[in-house]
């Protein structure tokens, strides 16, 4: 016999403008067209945007920046995470350490790097690098970028089922790579079986986070003060 399967189609650069019930289906509309579906999963987490959903009210945004060096060579560079591991320390405001396929050293931490001058990021990166990898000597930092994190007051993610056939998740609190993989499989199992026992957590009520903007500002201020202390060698 011949087996066929429907291959998924991935649409890019087509932000959702509206999500509405249309009979037994959901209509997901963008500026370029619409898709009808029996089931919809909103999995955009901190990058959820638009007036078509109030999901943004259920977390407060934070940020994480990374700084990348030029490609590093030599014995000192080869001793840094030689098996391609990622690493994090346990400081009050953590630092992440990894290397990419081009041999760059990537350092990261909590905070909005887009709001900080380049000299500040370089000084911070120099401080972390010289502590952990002093044998490297002076490093040239070439790139920096910032991503967004969805925080919740209790540091736990939220699973929602606002309506039949509609699921949402948010609030990974910076642990989206591993946790999101688990939730993705659990959502798939739940949509196929309808069994809530397949979910890692029960569904949460749709309760907005109070004072979300104030929380975001307070977190960012704390991160920035800590990084300033690192640059001034008050803390490490």
Annotate each language-model stretch with its function.
Residues 8-9, 166:
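Short, conserved active-site loop motifs that form the nucleotide-linked donor/cofactor pocket
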Residues 9-26:
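A conserved short coil-to-beta-strand element within the FAD-binding core of flavoproteins
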Residues 235-236:
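Terminal low-complexity segments of carbohydrate-biosynthetic enzymes
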Residues 115-117, 122-232:
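C-terminal catalytic lobe of FAD-dependent flavoproteins
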Residues 16, 34-74, 78-164:
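Active-site substrate-recognition segment that forms the wall
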Residues 3, 12, 24, 103, ...:
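Residue-level signal for beta-strand positions within conserved beta-sheet cores that form or flank
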Residues 1-7:
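Short, small-residue-biased leader/transition segments that mark boundaries at the very start
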């Amino acid at each position: 016999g011949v087996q066929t399967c429907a291959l998924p189609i991935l649409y890019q650069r087509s932000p959702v403008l509206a999500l509405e019930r249309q009979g037994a289906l959901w209509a997901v509309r963008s500026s370029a067209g619409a898709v009808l579906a029996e089931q919809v999963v909103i999995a955009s987490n901190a990058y959820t945007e638009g007036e078509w959903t109030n999901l943004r009210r259920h977390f407060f945004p934070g940020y994480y920046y990374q700084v990348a060096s030029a490609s590093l060579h030599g014995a000192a560079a080869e001793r840094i995470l030689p098996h391609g591991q990622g690493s994090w320390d346990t400081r009050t405001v953590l630092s992440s350490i990894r290397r990419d396929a081009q041999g760059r050293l990537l350092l990261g931490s909590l905070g909005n790097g887009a709001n900080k001058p380049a000299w500040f990021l370089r000084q911070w990166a120099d401080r972390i690098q010289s502590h952990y990898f002093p044998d490297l000597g002076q490093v040239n930092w070439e790139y920096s970028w910032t991503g967004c994190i969805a925080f919740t007051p209790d540091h736990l993610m939220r699973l929602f089922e606002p309506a039949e056939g509609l699921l949402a998740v948010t609030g990974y609190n910076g642990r989206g790579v591993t946790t999101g993989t688990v939730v993705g499989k659990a959502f798939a199992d739940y949509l196929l079986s309808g069994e809530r026992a397949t979910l890692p957590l029960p569904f949460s009520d749709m309760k907005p986070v109070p004072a979300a903007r104030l929380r975001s500002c307070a977190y960012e201020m704390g991160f920035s003060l800590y990084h300033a202390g690192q640059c001034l060698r008050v803390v490490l």
